[in-house]
Amino acid sequence: MFSNAFTDKTVMAELVAKMLWEIKAVHFRADEPYKLSSGMASPVYIDCRKLISYPRIRSAVMDFAAATILRDAGFEQFDVVAGGETAGIPFAAMLAERLGLPMIYVRKAPKGHGRNAQIEGHMPEGARVLVIEDLTTAGGSMFKFIDAIRAAGGIVEHGIALFYYDIFPEARGNMKSKGVDLHYIATWRNVLAVAREQALFDEKTLNEVEAFLNAPLAWSERNGGVGTLAAQ
């Protein structure tokens, strides 16, 4: 169960950013941009899955996730924690343990044989479900799982991402318009702040990353990626 240590939000964000650098889960590469699944060119890349391999770090991050949810959403607002296939599953298990709640996981699509189930585990009709993902950009992937839970009779009004890109100002509003409040611990701006503080890169690289965070689609288009995104 959660230890009830409610660390300040800004401290949590900075610590998670430092942890991500420590385990080399975040990368800056402005001169040879990454190509994201959306088609965007990006000077930044993150692999939150690495967190599960570092017990002390993953424990701290999940304590922060529990604190974020309890403080921002409430103590008695959920009946079930859900993780999306596949990255969200281990984090859902760890968060459910801390919150003292049952856990389910949601497939990207029904498995196509047997019960043809998309949701694994027990979710009562009308259950209030907290959905967790390792990261989200604009919430699109999270809604694939939310829609499946709602179709099966669950109620989803909150989602949490351990890491939120926070590069599209309209993203949280779009999620809110679909009935979901998004909670998160750290963003790219926290990661950039740590990189500047620790002088991890030259000034040109840091400035390119900041330019991307300020205008991601314009930066993408200038660097060979798409300049618009498909509607979420």
From Swiss-Prot:
Orotate binds at T137. One of its GO terms (biological process) is pyrimidine nucleobase biosynthetic process. 5-phospho-alpha-D-ribose 1-diphosphate binds at R107, K108, K111, H113, E133, D134, L135, T136, T137, A138, G139, G140, S141. Its EC number is 2.4.2.10. The keyword Ribosomal protein does not apply. Pathway: Pyrimidine metabolism; UMP biosynthesis via de novo pathway; UMP from orotate: step 1/2. It catalyses: orotidine 5'-phosphate + diphosphate = orotate + 5-phospho-alpha-D-ribose 1-diphosphate. Homodimer. This is Orotate phosphoribosyltransferase. It comes from Sinorhizobium fredii (strain NBRC 101917 / NGR234). The lineage of its organism: Bacteria, Pseudomonadati, Pseudomonadota, Alphaproteobacteria, Hyphomicrobiales. The gene is pyrE.
